Amino acid sequence: MNFTNTSKLLAAALCLATSYSYADSERPLFSLTMTESGVQQTNNDGSLAGATKSESRILPIWGDAARAKGYDLPEPFGASYSYMNLRQDIVVDSIKFEFTNPIFKPWEKQTIVNAGKTREKSETHMLKLDSWVLPFLNVYGVYGKTKGTSKTNLDTVYAPGAYEPWKNLPFELNFKGKTFGGGITLAGGYNQFFATLDTNYTRTNLDILDGDISALVITPRVGYEFVFEPLLAGQGNTKVQVWVGAMYQDITQRFKGNVSNLDLPPELALFDMIKKQTDIKFDVEQHLAHKWNNTLGARIEVTRNFNILSEVGFGNRNSFFISGEFRF
């Protein structure tokens, strides 16, 4: 049995096993509602209009008082479906291994992996339920599924008994999991200008890791609302909101798991021989290459009960987000 090659391959596999970072969240898992509460409603010429017809509701609290002052409040409850595509760079700081069989314990210090560039791509499908508790405060919960791919080029891999390190080893890792969490959105405006601040926290269970991945995402936005003639008769003015913003992500930086859960490439065929003699755990520390990126988005309120939203991220992180929402 060639332990040298096997050790190299194991190191390569484990390095990429933890190159995943969610928030990619997602969400990730981000502010899906941009209906601006606290923005005075206007006609299509920009003049202040009377309150849109809306019966008195339990929520939002103080909603009747806000409507009496001429503010246009969205329907209090919402349900939406969204899709997000995210691409970002990951920096792997360290990779360690643990062998349960005492015979292989010396390998823990002798196996050294230096990871190069790591690029992650992920797709997330998300369901969201929300409510405007106050005219300026939205509270929501999210649940969804994520799948993706992480690609890494391992600069060098040092293995026990090896005469030379293994260099420039490409590796691709596929992952999938479920995400759940919640958040709040603060919103306000002046005339047709508005601002929102969304904060959410999520946890993701991946099939290749032990435990959860936690993610904190904060997204400030500022924008302007355009008002047009109704697209559908009797449904009120059609509104189009455009905005610019930024997204901050803080993701769990340490991941652990079992090598046996990884979908290893054909080059790691010798791994099966090791797997029969010992369990091998990986422990990886990493961080996002960039925590902030820019965003640009738009939302079309087709009727008071249905809207479509889309947002793109650019700069240090690339993302595309789209959702459809029903309000009632």
Report the location of each language-model feature.
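Residues that define the transmembrane beta-barrel architecture of outer-membrane proteins
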Residues: 75, 121-125, 174-180, 212-218, ...
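Residues on the lipid-exposed face of transmembrane beta-strands in outer-membrane beta-barrel proteins
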Residues: 70, 81, 127-135, 141, ...
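Cleavable N-terminal export/targeting peptides
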Residues: 1-57
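Outer-membrane beta-barrel translocator domains and adjoining extracellular loop/strand segments
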Residues: 91-98, 151-158, 206-212, 254-261, ...
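Outer membrane beta-barrel transmembrane domains
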Residues: 241-328
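Short loop/turn motifs that connect adjacent beta-strands in outer-membrane beta-barrel proteins
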Residues: 24-26, 67-75, 131-136, 189-195, ...
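Transmembrane beta-strands of outer-membrane beta-barrel pores
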Residues: 83-89, 143-149, 188-192, 199-205, ...
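Transmembrane beta-strands of outer-membrane beta-barrel proteins
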Residues: 75-82, 139-141, 193-197, 218-220, ...
